[in-house]
A protein has these predicted regions:
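Glycine/Thr-rich beta-alpha phosphate-binding loop at enzyme active sites
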Residues: 73-74, 139-154, 185-242, 246, ...
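Glycine-rich phosphate-binding active-site loops on the catalytic face of alpha/beta enzymes
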Residues: 44-49, 135-140, 196-206, 253-254, ...
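C-terminal helical cap(s) of enzyme catalytic domains, especially alpha/beta-barrels
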Residues: 52-70, 208-222, 276-301
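Active-site beta->alpha loop and helix N-cap motifs at the rims of alpha/beta catalytic domains
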Residues: 67-150
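Glycine-rich, positively charged N-terminal anion/phosphate-binding segment
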Residues: 2-7, 27-101
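Glycine-rich beta-to-alpha transition loops that act as phosphate-gripper elements at the mouths
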Residues: 22-24, 106-110, 175-181, 246-258
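Catalytic cores of alpha/beta
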Residues: 29-33, 115-122, 179-192, 242-243, ...
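Iron-sulfur cluster-binding cysteine motifs and their immediate structural context
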Residues: 341-359, 370-383
Length: 383
């Protein structure tokens, strides 16, 4: 049987799955339930002072986007923990600790670095925190916190520097995807002393408009999460993993063991999940871990060290890929159902039908691969 244990920033986890800072961990009992389901680590909703600018709406703050009835993502107007710092310190962290998972505590980067340092000291003095995760990345906060700090390498550096100086346990920082170049921000965090980075928080977004009423589904800007954001997260993850030597916790779009493996193959040390639990409950944690264990055994891997970062070397610039020999669509006639989807979607007009059989013309095929992705029978390949 594979050993699912991993080490992140010097702390050992029983498996690489972590409950991200979000609604399922809004209190100590939620974190304890996640731990009871088998998760390796838990992160509470971001802890900070109870201020007016930290309050979130209670009149509907989640809007789910669907494609053909299937949820693909959601916009949320969640901010930070609605429990006060004192409630977490006096009661909730102790409840969460009873679950037995690693306690990776999310704290808010305050408007001034010295305020952040004070919060760091308050949380770690409880003795319940194993690591700290500094939130400089919430996509819809007041103008002095969240991504307004994390979009700036200079402000991120100052916050991490102050927090790390006050910390006696591993200190990490959660980055924002709402930037052009995350590498610059991650490098600044490393230079300031961060032990690790989380990639990443949600994407600033808008829910949309009900065209029957002309009113937005939700009136405020929110954070987009779920499966639809995974390609964006993978882009940031790979760029940082290839350019900054720092442990990474990946989060965004994890709905099963497959994404856990993908993120680790792209350089992540561990992987956080939120939406899967929000959509399916804490039992989803157990399913993902069991599936992960079965996959590792099936592949013959003994530990995640064997696969961590193995996909990074395959990434290449487009100009290099353009020099590779072209490939052309080939239709397996024994599998093809003659549905015609490939022909309808081929804008190079390379696919045609004759006597009930579909053919691909190499002279017209441009090797885009759309037909291979859209064929419901998996009858088309590029070769």
């Amino acid at each position: 049987m594979a050993n699912l244990e991993i080490t992140y920033c010097g702390v050992k986890y029983r498996n690489p799955l972590i409950l991200a800072s979000a609604t399922p961990g809004w209190d100590g009992e939620g974190l304890r339930l996640a731990a009871a389901a088998g998760i390796g680590g838990v992160i509470p909703k971001t802890i900070g002072p109870k201020q007016d600018w930290a309050a979130h709406p209670r009149n509907g703050r989640i809007f789910m986007h669907r494609y053909k009835g299937r949820p693909i993502g959601q916009v949320n107007l969640e901010l930070f923990s609605t429990m006060s710092r004192d409630e977490w310190i006096s009661k909730e962290l102790e409840i969460a600790k009873k679950g037995g998972a690693v306690m990776h505590i999310s704290i808010l980067a305050m408007p001034e670095p010295d305020e952040t340092a004070a919060l760091v000291r308050q949380i770690q003095e409880t003795g319940f925190a194993d690591l700290l995760e500094l939130n400089v990345s919430c996509p819809m906060p007041a103008s002095t916190v969240g991504m307004h700090i994390g979009k700036s390498a200079e402000r991120t550096y100052k916050q991490v520097k102050a927090g790390k100086a006050a910390a006696s346990i591993p200190f990490t920082v959660k980055l924002t995807p709402n930037v052009t170049d995350m590498v610059e921000i991650a490098q600044a965090a490393k230079e300031a002393g961060a032990d690790g980075v989380t990639i990443s928080n949600s994407i600033r977004s808008f829910s949309g408009v009900d065209i029957e009423t002309g009113k937005p589904y939700m009136r405020g800007y929110g954070g987009y999460t779920g499966p639809a954001i995974k390609p964006v997260i993978m882009r940031h993850l790979t760029e940082v993993a290839r350019n900054v030597d720092i442990p990474i916790s990946a989060v965004g779009g994890v709905t099963g063991f497959h994404e856990v493996v993908e993120y680790i193959m792209l350089g992540a040390s561990n992987v956080q999940t939120c939406t899967a639990v929000m959509w399916n409950g804490y039992g989803e944690i157990t399913r993902i871990i069991n599936d992960l264990n079965n996959w590792m055994d099936k592949k013959g891997y003994k530990s995640f060290d064997e696969i961590r970062g193995i996909a990074l070397k395959e990434i290449a610039p487009i100009e290099e890929l353009a020099l590779l020999p072209p490939k052309f669509a080939k239709i397996d006639k024994s599998v093809c159902t003659n549905c015609g989807i490939c022909e309808k979607l081929c804008f190079y007009r390379a696919i045609s039908e004759k006597n009930g059989i579909r053919f691909a013309d190499k002279g017209r095929c441009d090797g885009c691969g759309v037909c291979t992705q859209m064929c419901p029978a998996n009858a088309v390949v590029l070769e």
